[in-house]
Amino acid sequence: MALGLEDKKAIVAEVNEAAKIALSAVVANSRGVTVGKMNALRAQARAEGVNLRLVRNTLARRALEGTDFACLADLFIGPTILAFSNEHPGAAARLLKDFAKANDQFEIKGLAFEGEFIEAAQLDRLATLPTYDEAIAQLMATMKEAAAGKLVRTLAAIRDQKEESAA
């Protein structure tokens, strides 16, 4: 069924609003992926705070004009999925990377972060970013390790000092 002008304007406005609040965006080609797998991907995306949109290419180009993701416009060829990360910059990249591993026909075309276009081959730049909680845990582990190391070195120095004074 053909979309009317008002419907198209509403879709462009929705995608534009999603793009304005998103931290990063990933563009993928869904040709050859079954409907059941796509529905599972959508459910997983909702659970992870990723806004997944299947939009006509012309409407997607118009929706992304004036946003940080306008650099993705050249990728809109064929059946295109737009995935916006709302909570963590690497969420959409990680989600689609895992989905692409399980589905050979699913192809990631590229992504954008803070207005910078990133090739699909460099997907790991964003997909491997730790979440806020993971980064805090890594920082705490490093700090704890440093403190424990200082304590061990201090105790060893005291032991050496006592051995020297006893000798």
Swiss-Prot record:
<keyword id="KW-0699">rRNA-binding</keyword>
<protein>
    <recommendedName>
        <fullName>Large ribosomal subunit protein uL10</fullName>
    </recommendedName>
</protein>
<dbReference type="Pfam" id="PF00466">
    <property type="entry name" value="Ribosomal_L10"/>
</dbReference>
<dbReference type="GO" id="GO:0006412">
    <property type="term" value="P:translation"/>
</dbReference>
<dbReference type="InterPro" id="IPR001790">
    <property type="entry name" value="Ribosomal_uL10"/>
</dbReference>
<comment type="similarity">
    <text>Belongs to the universal ribosomal protein uL10 family.</text>
</comment>
<keyword id="KW-0687">Ribonucleoprotein</keyword>
<dbReference type="InterPro" id="IPR047865">
    <property type="entry name" value="Ribosomal_uL10_bac_type"/>
</dbReference>
<dbReference type="InterPro" id="IPR002363">
    <property type="entry name" value="Ribosomal_uL10_CS_bac"/>
</dbReference>
<keyword id="KW-0694">RNA-binding</keyword>
<keyword id="KW-0689">Ribosomal protein</keyword>
<comment type="function">
    <text>Forms part of the ribosomal stalk, playing a central role in the interaction of the ribosome with GTP-bound translation factors.</text>
</comment>
<dbReference type="GO" id="GO:0003735">
    <property type="term" value="F:structural constituent of ribosome"/>
</dbReference>
<dbReference type="InterPro" id="IPR022973">
    <property type="entry name" value="Ribosomal_uL10_bac"/>
</dbReference>
<dbReference type="GO" id="GO:0015934">
    <property type="term" value="C:large ribosomal subunit"/>
</dbReference>
<dbReference type="InterPro" id="IPR043141">
    <property type="entry name" value="Ribosomal_uL10-like_sf"/>
</dbReference>
<comment type="subunit">
    <text>Part of the ribosomal stalk of the 50S ribosomal subunit. The N-terminus interacts with L11 and the large rRNA to form the base of the stalk. The C-terminus forms an elongated spine to which L12 dimers bind in a sequential fashion forming a multimeric L10(L12)X complex.</text>
</comment>
<dbReference type="GO" id="GO:0070180">
    <property type="term" value="F:large ribosomal subunit rRNA binding"/>
</dbReference>
